[in-house]
Amino acid sequence: MAVADRLAERGLEIPPAQVIPPGVRLTYRRLVRWGDVAYIAGHGPTNGESWGSKLGKVGRELTVEEAVAAAELTALNVLGTIERELGGLDGIACWLKVNGYVNAVDGFTEQARVINGFSDLILDLYGEDRLAARTSIGVPHLPFDMPVEVDAVVALA
């Protein structure tokens, strides 16, 4: 079954591309393809021109459950970049590496649970044999006060 069909089965849609706020200059590419590998820059829980989740620290402004949902939305944004840049979602042979960053209060220890929101969607869409190695890290701040940011590396078929 095509990845787009699996998304539709779950009632999920790829959000519009992130619109960079006026006055903000970001000097990078969202995806770089080098041979049969694609490197995907850090993405957050955006929905086009707006934030698709609350902003702030997990454990203060966001509950763990809200952060898990933000991580799932981040996965949808990463998929959107892949779809726009590579022309589809079915050409991924394997998710090689995922780095998840959680903007959290001091002492927060559930980073892995939060980033499961990203990984669980990838698992549902691509299966266990294409699931990435992963790191989940707690950080004191993220750009724009995002609750989560994720970057990834995928092998292309």
Range-by-range predicted roles:
Residues 1-76, 80-98, 104-157:
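N-terminal presequence-like segments and the immediate start of the first folded domain
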